[in-house]
């Protein structure tokens, strides 16, 4: 490790991968599922099998059963709830007080719902309170929870006004993610094929102020994915750019974060069209935690497979460097990362892949964008075998065109 005067993309990328067990998976006893998720700064989990794979691939010898035990065991170390961007994530149970404080403090954008369908601030608080009361000590399906919420609030909460995948949802569901952010709702084990919800355990940890939680979240993000710019943090958090710029400026003034110079030829995407240049030290600057300026001297080498919505793919920038050349069009969905499982070669996206399951048999189709060397082909075969181990199946590698489109 060294502290360079100018940080290259390859050095920044190598540090990110190293810190979240992608360069070298955690050895047995080094880190469990909760520690791995903590290093990832949450694991997106709307596709359960993909989230299990994200975590399992970062741990040598782990399977999805290790992840499930961390979620649903007698003393769970992971919670499945609504996290960054209002999407479903795994979060470490021990860190839930921090996350609820940070997510509750975060500035949000405009409501996506029609004015007549929105909840007033008082209605929002009433529903969040009702959700917490209804889930205390029990596990409810969405229909059971809906009945409880409407009974505790009023018929207005059950009005079918929210567009859904098939039909309409009741008004109260517009704040389910907020209930998760407030720490009064999380997922529980399925009841058959039905999803259930419960209230997470109350922690004895001291409550963080909104300012403390926000500072810690920014520092955690920069430790995992820095150097980064305010708008990259804002994109990850689904928060307004202006709010993020203000937070970064405040932390910089307090000496909590510092600017480093990124190699100018590698920061085209990072150049800001906004008026943050003076705050960030120039178009080639990005931020790290104060004092965290050492980077690996060697670039990443090797082949990795990452599933849908992997945290590294979503949070790492600049996109044009992580998805170079044809990968930018093939492995992104309208510029959105995570919608395709990706093949990494030497730390950058070099293809896409898809797995189809039939019983214990897994057919893993990998589409490299360029021909792999013999050594890379052997590494790929090993990665496919590891995917099978994590998902408790027997995996077969097929190299060819992936015909499945982007995940919604």
Language-model regions: role of each:
Residues 1-162, 168, 408:
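Phosphate-backbone binding and catalysis cores of DNA-processing enzymes
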Residues 72-83, 87-88, 181-190, 253-262:
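A short, conserved structural fragment
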Residues 90-96, 191-211, 281-297:
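Short, cationic-aromatic polyanion-contact patches
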Residues 101-114, 201-219, 302-304, 312:
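Short, amphipathic alpha-helical interaction segments positioned at domain boundaries
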Residues 255-263, 281-328:
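Non-catalytic regulatory appendages
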